[in-house]
């Protein structure tokens, strides 16, 4: 859970890539495209690690009951509107139809519509079911599943008022959450640009670039040094703070070394992921430990026994194999830069 939760800052849409692009002046669309293939590879390595570990130690992943294909298909149908919305938002950016800001506005509007429709008796599912039933070639099982969705929630007394109150609460929480996130991003950007201006005014960035150039490092050597630097920094510093305080200094260094900033951005975001699960300061580790404690306490109360939650050291040890997966993917991206830059070059043209 801790490692999988970090995938969100690599697989688009990603706040981490947006912040990186704004700080270094890189195209958000190119960064989103660049993060797709490494993100999928990282997710696959996580799945392989889980599969191998569960074969070696079967007790860590007990087998669940088999789920019928009918239920699997029902789950896919319920995800169809969300999937189409994600495809529309990212696709409009990738194909140059809309800017990231325009696509974000369209995505918010679509998500709001789906949320309100879902709280109004699953209107979206009913519409999909009505359209699909017009095609006689579909299997009867498909139509049956969709009919089940339409009749799953009959209207009960007081349900309309409850749905209206629920919608109002959803809108309220959405607006507050958006305001908090937007304020956080704007404060980070304000601090980053202020720091960048201050470093430029006192020539710290220029002096740093000249100091690094004096070592006559190759591009590969420079990247490896930066990887080690960020791995060490991530053990005692929060990930976004790490990016905020170092990028303004590194931009001239990367420019002098002719480093592709899209390629380096993907490497850096994976390093930010590693920082989130790096002992002893990884934020995701403490979130997971808190969730473990709450879950164990609720389970113990249900069974009438004392809770026996493991220590944070168990979480530290548990994430080590997944950090190894991140190191493998970083190595692949360094060895094969095309993993990050091929897709944006194909979609938007090389530079």
Which positions does each model-derived feature cover?
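Alpha-helical transmembrane segments of multi-pass membrane transport proteins
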Residues: 1-351
């Amino acid at each position: 859970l801790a490692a999988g939760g970090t995938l969100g800052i690599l697989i688009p849409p990603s706040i981490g890539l947006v912040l990186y692009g704004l700080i270094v002046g890189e195209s958000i669309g190119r960064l989103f495209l660049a993060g797709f293939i490494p993100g999928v590879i990282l997710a696959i390595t996580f799945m392989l690690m889980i599969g191998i570990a569960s074969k070696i130690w079967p007790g860590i992943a007990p087998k669940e009951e088999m789920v019928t294909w009918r239920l699997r298909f029902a789950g896919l149908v319920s995800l169809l509107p969300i999937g189409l919305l994600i495809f529309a938002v990212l696709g409009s950016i990738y194909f140059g139809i809309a800017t990231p800001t325009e696509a974000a506005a369209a995505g918010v509007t679509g998500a709001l519509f789906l949320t309100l429709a879902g709280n109004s008796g699953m209107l979206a599912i009913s519409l999909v079911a009505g359209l699909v039933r017009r095609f006689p070639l579909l299997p009867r099982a498909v139509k049956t599943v969709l009919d089940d969705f339409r009749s799953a929630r009959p209207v009960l007394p007081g349900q309309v008022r409850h749905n209206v109150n629920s919608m109002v609460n959803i809108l309220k929480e959405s607006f507050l959450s958006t305001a908090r996130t937007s304020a956080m991003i704007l404060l980070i950007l304000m601090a980053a640009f202020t720091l960048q201006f201050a470093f430029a005014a006192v020539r710290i960035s220029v002096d740093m670039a000249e100091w690094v150039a004096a070592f006559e490092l190759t591009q590969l050597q420079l990247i490896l040094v930066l990887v080690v630097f960020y791995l060490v920094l991530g053990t005692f510093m929060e990930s976004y703070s790490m990016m905020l305080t170092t990028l303004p200094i590194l931009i001239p260094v990367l420019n002098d070394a002719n480093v592709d900033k899209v390629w380096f951005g993907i490497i850096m975001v994976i390093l930010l992921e590693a920082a989130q699960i790096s002992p002893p300061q990884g934020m995701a580790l403490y979130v997971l430990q808190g969730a473990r404690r709450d879950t164990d306490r609720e389970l113990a109360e249900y069974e009438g026994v004392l809770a026996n939650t493991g220590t944070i050291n168990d979480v530290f040890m548990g994430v080590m194999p997944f950090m190894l997966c991140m190191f493998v993917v970083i190595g692949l991206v360094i060895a094969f830069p095309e993993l990050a830059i091929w897709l944006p070059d194909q979609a938007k043209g090389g530079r």
